[in-house]
Amino acid sequence: MNAITIFFIILSTVAVCIIIFQLYSIYLNYDNIKEFNSAHSAFEFSKSVNTLSLDRTIKDPNDDIYDPKQKWRCVKLDNDYVSVSMFGFKSNGSEIRKFKNLESCIDYTFSQSTHSDIKNPCILQNGIKSKECIFLKSMF
């Protein structure tokens, strides 16, 4: 084998490895790709999508949390959805922030609320017997 043959063998091996890495990346993100395609299928033949797309894979508040109890989630409380974790509820000042549907709760929790107030009703005086504190304890 001469040097040119070895060079082309190495080059073809690198090319095959890059293709395998790309296929694996597509495999890992297949659900996100399907979601994007279904959301933008109406714009298939347009020059640009011309809409804002929310990519929750960039920054997620749960990325750096390893304890499942501390992870943020949207759950139903009475007839509304709330953002809850072991720390408490996401709030807008003194009241728990409530959402009419699950999608708006998810959008707020995982995109808009990077630095929002958190209300824990269990640390307030007489809050241990409140409905919100009992609900929070039942979640964990």
From Swiss-Prot:
Subcellular location: Virion membrane
Taxonomic superkingdom: Viruses
BP GO terms, sorted: membrane fusion involved in viral entry into host cell; symbiont entry into host cell
Residue ranges crossing the lipid bilayer per the database entry: 1-21
Annotated GO CC locations: membrane; viral envelope; virion membrane
Main location: virion
Segments on the Virion surface side according to the record's topology features: 22-140
One matching Pfam family: Pox_A28
UniProt keywords, alphabetically: Disulfide bond, Fusion of virus membrane with host membrane, Late protein, Membrane, Signal-anchor, Transmembrane, Transmembrane helix, Viral envelope protein, Viral penetration into host cytoplasm, Virion, Virus entry into host cell
PTM text: Contains two intramolecular disulfide bonds. They are created by the viral disulfide bond formation pathway, a poxvirus-specific pathway that operates on the cytoplasmic side of the MV membranes.
Membrane topology: Single-pass type II membrane protein
Function: Envelope protein required for virus entry into host cell and for cell-cell fusion (syncytium formation).
Family indicated by similarity: Belongs to the poxviridae A28 protein family.
Protein name: Envelope protein A28 homolog
Species annotation: Lumpy skin disease virus (LSDV)
